[in-house]
């Protein structure tokens, strides 16, 4: 018989840096999950992706056990890393902060493909390009 799910928790945690401090501790604590168990597993699984923010979906079961799925980093984080930006533009329509090639857009789209609801890489590329535009990044062909 399958275990009964009592909750799902979605968090974005820096890779390899999960600690029992907020936001992780309180979110897991209210569902009665072993916080140290989660932080150790998460840090071990994401140690190779240091410096990235990793979205994670934690499924909590009735017996207080849990399972979790890590996703690919958000598109904005990947764009900032590819262009070595601190942050996007405060006024993306007026101030442009960087230029990005379509090859870089394709690379990020291929990395994000498993988590995007896009049928093709081209559709994924247009999603990534839209995110880049909203950050004040100009896409060049």
Curated annotation (Swiss-Prot):
Its gene is rplK
Q: Which organism encodes this protein? A: Clostridioides difficile (strain 630)
A cellular-component GO term for this protein: cytosolic large ribosomal subunit
- What's any GO biological process attached to this entry? translation
Q: Which domain of life is it from?
A: Bacteria
Assembly and partners are described as: Part of the ribosomal stalk of the 50S ribosomal subunit. Interacts with L10 and the large rRNA to form the base of the stalk. L10 forms an elongated spine to which L12 dimers bind in a sequential fashion forming a multimeric L10(L12)X complex.
Per the record, the similarity remark reads: Belongs to the universal ribosomal protein uL11 family.
Which key words tag this protein in UniProt?
Answer: Methylation, Ribonucleoprotein, Ribosomal protein, RNA-binding, rRNA-binding
Q: What is the lineage of its organism?
A: Bacteria, Bacillati, Bacillota, Clostridia, Peptostreptococcales
The record's function comment reads: Forms part of the ribosomal stalk which helps the ribosome interact with GTP-bound translation factors.
This protein is called Large ribosomal subunit protein uL11
């Amino acid at each position: 018989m399958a275990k009964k799910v009592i909750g799902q928790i979605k968090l974005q945690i820096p890779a390899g840096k999960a600690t029992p401090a907020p936001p992780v501790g309180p979110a897991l604590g209210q569902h009665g999950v072993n916080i140290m168990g989660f932080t150790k597993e998460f840090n071990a699984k994401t140690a190779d992706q240091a410096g990235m923010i990793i979205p994670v979906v934690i499924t909590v079961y009735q017996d207080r056990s849990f399972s979790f799925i890590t996703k690919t980093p958000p598109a904005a984080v990947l764009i900032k890393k590819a262009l070595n930006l601190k942050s996007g533009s405060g006024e993306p329509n007026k101030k442009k902060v960087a230029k990005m090639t379509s090859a870089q857009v394709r690379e990020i789209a291929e990395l994000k493909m498993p988590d995007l609801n896009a049928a093709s890489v081209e559709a994924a590329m247009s999603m990534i390009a839209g995110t880049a535009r909203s950050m004040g990044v100009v896409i060049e062909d």
